[in-house]
Amino acid sequence: MINTAKDPNELPRVREHALRVAIRLDASKTPEAIQAMAKDQNSSIRKSAAFGSRYVREKAVVPILIGMIADDERFVALSAVQSLWILTLHETEFHDWDASTKADRQEWMAEWTEWWNGEKETFQIPEPRRRSPKIQG
């Protein structure tokens, strides 16, 4: 599955599906595929890598996602930062992603890089937030 996800000659939908399956089977083995997909020319492949990363509880995906914040495509960058928020629980200033330019996103990537450089040695991926059970009434 990992090799299929990384293969630039494979159909995009096949690669995206291969990544989803690989994450379900053993997420700890997927950062290498996510890294390859994050650099793909096809923006839907990059978005799939950014989105899928939120289910990979490995520190190795954090710098990959940080690098994706400055992506040319806003929707890829937004997916990357949402995955970062989910994985790290790191709170950042509010930024207007809808109106952002590539220069804005490069600045925001620098903010995340600075944070990561200070945290990466000791950082532990926190437990995922659990949804509160609905109160029966």
Model-based region annotation:
Residues 69-74, 85-89, 102-105:
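TPR/TPR-like (Sel1-like) alpha-helical repeat modules
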Residues 1-7, 27-39, 58-70, 90-98:
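Amphipathic alpha-helical scaffolding segments comprising HEAT/armadillo-like alpha-solenoid repeats
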Residues 9-11, 41-42, 72-73:
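Short inter-helical turns and helix N-cap capping residues of alpha-solenoid HEAT/ARM repeat scaffolds
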Residues 21-24, 52-55, 83-86, 115, ...:
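Core register positions within helices of long alpha-helical scaffolds
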Residues 18, 49, 80-83, 112:
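Conserved hydrophobic register position within alpha-solenoid helical repeats
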Residues 93-137:
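Terminal, low-structured helical/coil segments at or just beyond the last alpha-helical repeat
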